[in-house]
A protein has these predicted regions:
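Compositionally biased, intrinsically disordered low-complexity segments enriched
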Residues: 4-5, 94, 123, 136
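Bacterial N-terminal signal peptides
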Residues: 9-19
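Bacterial N-terminal signal peptides that target proteins for export
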Residues: 1-11
Length: 238
């Protein structure tokens, strides 16, 4: 009888261990991703001069690996953009952080993003602003980004399929507008939808592109060039 009890206890213990293995693996995997995210912030973002503590915390919080295709997950926290299909990319982490810092978000802003892509930039913005409206011209990307953001609990992001050159006039004015693809020239429609005191951050240009920051004060636009960049071109609607 005692041997039988020992045998049953042994079997039970083995089952417990086996049941714990997947959970342990998941925990190890998540911990590893968290460590990679921390290294990304420290070595790629802080080291290059991004210092806004809210932006840094948002970059630590958003799980970038959940916004890239499965075969690129291992590269999610590396220092370069990644393809997401349909000729589009998820931007380099540093560029995401830099552009977000340039927006000077305090938490009460209504933001317009042109080019949802994977939804990663929108997720970062959602932690720093009141509402984020995002336009994506590639419908499959808009659908997958909407599903991913909902799944991860980013409830203040609103995605629409449409032409980014036209903006979203029914939701204007916006405190901040961000473009994640490069037009040859910043569309006047977007400048018109920028509210008084607002900020627009975007790449601009064809082959040679510059990251620019526009501010609107007393109805006048001031433009500042930040650095040279390389983004996918901004696509016109049909």
């Amino acid at each position: 009888m005692q041997q039988k009890n020992i045998f049953l206890i042994t079997i039970f213990s083995m089952l417990c261990v086996l049941n714990c293995i997947p959970a342990a693996c998941r925990m190890k995997g998540e911990t590893s991703m968290e460590q990679l995210r921390e290294l990304m912030v420290k070595n790629q973002i802080e080291a290059r001069g991004v210092s806004d503590t809210r932006v840094l915390e948002a970059m630590r919080s958003v799980e970038r690996h959940k916004f890239v295709p499965g075969h690129h997950i291992a590269s999610a926290y590396e220092d370069h953009p990644l393809p997401i299909g349909h000729g589009q990319t998820i931007s380099q982490p540093y560029i995401v952080a830099l552009m977000t810092e340039l927006c000077e978000l305090k938490g009460k802003e209504k933001v317009l993003e042109i080019g949802t892509g994977s939804g990663y930039q929108a997720a970062v913005l959602s932690l720093l602003a009141r509402e984020v409206y995002s336009i994506e011209i590639v419908e499959p990307l808009a659908i997958s980004a909407s599903e991913k953001l909902a799944e991860l609990g980013y409830t203040n992001v609103h995605i629409r399929v449409g032409d980014g050159y036209k903006g979203m006039p029914d939701k204007a004015p916006f405190d901040v507008i961000m473009l994640t693809a490069s037009p040859p020239k910043i569309p006047q429609a977007l400048i018109d939808q920028l509210g008084e005191g607002g900020i627009l951050v975007a790449p601009e240009g064809d082959y040679s592109q510059e990251l620019v920051k526009l501010t609107k004060q007393n109805g006048k636009i001031t433009k500042r060039t930040i650095t040279y960049v390389r983004f996918v071109p901004m696509i016109h609607g049909s």
